[in-house]
Amino acid sequence: SVTEEVKGGYLQFDAKGELLGLRYALGAGMRYASTRQSSTGINGTLPVTFERTYDDWLPSMNIAPFPTDKIILRGAIADVMTRPTLGSLTPGGSADGFNYRVSFGNPNLDPYRATAYDLAAEWYFAPQSIFSVAVFKKDVKSFPVSATLTGQTFTSTGLPASVLSASSPAFLNPAQQAQPIWTVVTTVNGTGASLKGIEIAVQAPFRFLPGFLKN
């Protein structure tokens, strides 16, 4: 089983004004999150519990200049964090003694952490209409990824033989549990990545359509 206790807070500052004749809106903030995690499972024949606490300080800022009444430019930068799913954090697992396959979680997974950059230009060319172009980049510092390890032994996983089906070859022949014929599927910490992209969007009401289809 896995439990999480999360505490946090957020401080936000907003401002509007004009600089050198250019109107703008500005927002900045800092979010703090403290996560206490407890993961319990079976290792060998004994229950084991992993506990840890980690803290995240997540600053963010966005600004939106208004060159004209119909054009808005937007820029934003933010540190973001998403915790791993609870199911991937359990130290326990399951085993298939017919196909020599073991699946279990990893209580030491790091959260998804990244710095996100966004730039956008929006043109409101008509009522209820917009054309926008946006570019984004995400510098990912850590993220959980699935890993498949071959040539492993069942005994190295720490799982008890009781998780095997009593009719499986691996249970009936215990020597197979120490042979490197097993495939272990788990989740590990990724080394990071960089994502880039562009988005183009158009929105407009269909005023030219007839009858009930109009707008």
Predicted stretch roles:
Residues E18-Y24, P67-K70, Q128, R207-N215:
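Short loop/turn motifs that connect adjacent beta-strands in outer-membrane beta-barrel proteins
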Residues G9-A15, M61-P65, L119-W123, I200-A204:
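Residues on the lipid-exposed face of transmembrane beta-strands in outer-membrane beta-barrel proteins
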Residues T3-G9, T53-W57, S103, R113-Y117, ...:
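Residues that define the transmembrane beta-barrel architecture of outer-membrane proteins
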